[in-house]
Each structure stands twice: as C-alpha cells, then as structure tokens.
C-alpha cells in the first residue's frame, strides 16, 4: 500500500511537535499535553494537530489557547525540520476520542454489571 506524502509529513510533524512540547514552551497555560494525532491536507497547506491534556474543561481550553498562540513559533521550528517550500499552517484541536472511548467503556461495564449471571437459564 502506498503512503501519501501528506501521511509522511504528518508523521514528521507529530514527532517534531512532540519533541518541542517535551522541551517545554514558556506558556503557563499549556499543561501536560500529549499529541494524539496529526492530519495534513492533501495540498500540505494545513495541519490539524489533535491533543489531550490532563485536567478539567478549563485546563483543556487554556491549553488549546496556549498551543494556538504558540503555533507561529512551532510552525517556524517545523520549517527547519520539514525543509519544504511551504510549511503547513497549524491548528490545534482537542481530541475528544479518549473521552468518547471512556464513555463507551463505562456503558459496556454498566450493561455487564446489569447482567445477574442468569444467562444459562435462558438457553
């Protein structure tokens, strides 16, 4: 299976931004952030970076605001690594998939505990 160029660029962006965040940005709004995924458009002009953060809703919003305000610096650092004619614009978005997955797990557990073990009688 062939990989699109945008997939390779997304992988490079993912590792580079993870490295930048591990070194730390000088913004107190940014909490403990984990990059969960990167989507790059086929024309390589926009990169959506999905992240999660430990904390409440206020921590999520402040981290997203901090990351988006640091996007210009991060884009500059990406330009050094990517060595492309045009470095993609960056947009940080909170990744709700973990919360969604947790909700599904909770519902499955709830259904499982609602079962009183009388399955053998129904057969």
From Swiss-Prot:
Keywords per UniProt = Cytoplasm, Ribosome biogenesis
KW Cytoplasm (keyword) present: yes
**A GO term from the CC aspect:** cytosol
Where does this polypeptide localize?
Answer: Cytoplasm
* Top-rank taxon: Bacteria
Q: Which Gene3D superfamilies match?
A: 3.30.300.20
A Pfam family per the record: RBFA
Coiled-coil portions: none
What biological process terms from GO does the record include? Answer: maturation of SSU-rRNA
Keyword Cytoplasm on entry: yes
Q: Which GO terms describe its molecular function?
A: ribosomal small subunit binding
The family assignment reads:
Belongs to the RbfA family.
Protein purpose: One of several proteins that assist in the late maturation steps of the functional core of the 30S ribosomal subunit. Associates with free 30S ribosomal subunits (but not with 30S subunits that are part of 70S ribosomes or polysomes). Required for efficient processing of 16S rRNA. May interact with the 5'-terminal helix region of 16S rRNA.
Q: How does it assemble?
A: Monomer. Binds 30S ribosomal subunits, but not 50S ribosomal subunits or 70S ribosomes.
List the protein's name: Ribosome-binding factor A
């Amino acid at each position: 299976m062939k990989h699109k160029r945008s997939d390779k660029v997304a992988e490079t962006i993912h590792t580079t931004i993870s490295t930048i965040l591990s070194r730390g940005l000088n913004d107190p709004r940014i909490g403990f952030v984990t990059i969960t995924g990167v989507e790059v458009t086929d024309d390589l002009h926009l990169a959506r970076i999905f992240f999660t953060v430990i904390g409440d809703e206020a921590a999520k919003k402040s981290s997203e605001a901090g990351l988006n305000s640091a996007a210009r610096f991060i884009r500059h650092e990406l330009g050094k690594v990517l060595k492309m004619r045009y470095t993609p614009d960056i947009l940080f978005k909170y990744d709700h998939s973990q919360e969604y997955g947790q909700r599904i797990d909770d519902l499955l557990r709830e259904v499982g505990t609602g079962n009183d073990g009388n399955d053998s009688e129904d057969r």
